[in-house]
Amino acid sequence: MKTLVAAFVLALGFAAVALRAQNEPNLIPDVVDPAKLIPILPEAPTGWTAEKAEGSSDDVGGFKITNVHRDYRKGEAAEAPTAAISILDAVANPDYVEATTGAWNQASETAEGYGKPVTIDGNPGREDYDKERKQASLWVMVAKRYFVEIELQNQEPKELQEWIKRVDLKKLAEIKK
């Protein structure tokens, strides 16, 4: 009988915790609608073409993310310069934000390329360059929620600075929901 009473009390305790958890407010902020981020993706610069911007909100491993993306190309040749800009709203996964940005502080340089921390308009970031593949990438964290990624192919890494200037980081930081 004592075992039955103990099991009953234990079950009531678990039920009470579960009910309390159901009534607690969700403290994880919602990601923004992709339609609010797509206008932040710039138009093609002179001499370039841009594909239609795309975006979606998805549930990834129990966390929601919003991602918008646009591809750019200069010319039709096989080795033509290309660029891709993505904006990822990761506000619902602060552990991912912390782990990713924490790794940006390490600088390295080899004969194959380099990786280094950067600051863009007060925002932390990371720049990487692979010499053999002629591939440059820049990641910038905006408002502790948005990852802006620029990836260039067949361009010099200094071009990353020109591309990031085309993205209105201040306007992006103001978008909350």
Label for each model-derived stretch:
Residues 110, 125, 134-135, 158, ...:
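Acidic/polar, low-complexity extended loops/arms that serve as protein-protein interfaces
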Residues 17-21:
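Sec/Tat signal peptide C-region and signal peptidase I cleavage site
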Residues 94-99, 136-139, 159-163:
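A short, polar/proline- and glycine-enriched secondary-structure boundary/capping micro-motif
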Residues 7-15:
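Bacterial N-terminal signal peptides
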Residues 1-5:
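Positively charged n-region of N-terminal signal peptides that target proteins for export
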Residues 23-133:
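Short, solvent-exposed recognition patches
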Residues 151-177:
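Surface-exposed amphipathic alpha-helical segments
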Residues 133-159:
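Short, well-structured beta-strand
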